[in-house]
Amino acid sequence: WTLLVQYSNLRFFGAGPEETYQDRKHAKLGVWSTDAFKDHAPYLMPQETGNHEDVRWAEITDEKGHGLRISRAEGAEPFAMSLQPYSSFMLEEAQHQDELPAPKHMFLRVLAEQMGVGGDDSWMSPVHPQYHIPADQPISLDVDLDLI
């Protein structure tokens, strides 16, 4: 979802506080607070960043505490999510951090699954098969959305 730029605060119950992926879950389960700007890792080459795994609920708010709460529906699996000042397209188009535009929106992703990132070493390690998402199998996401 594309949100107004002022909705940059993130509070969530999941694996954190740093970014986590299926193959990068060395984190504690807890309630964490951050914002989209702190969650964006300034890698030398802009790329996927800021994902959070095993999320039970997340609140995206403005400075007054108004916003959106996403929570897993009763009986549903935890989800993955991120809140970033850049879209996936913006990250793919930029070769360096200084090529990213000034943020005008926040980009909220809520995912049933997020593929692993690989990189067991620093030179082209692929994602291990157990962290792939099979394209021939159904995936479901069941969440509740509430205004706060």
Language-model segment annotations:
Residues W1-I148:
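Beta-strand/loop-rich accessory regions of lumenal/periplasmic or secreted enzymes
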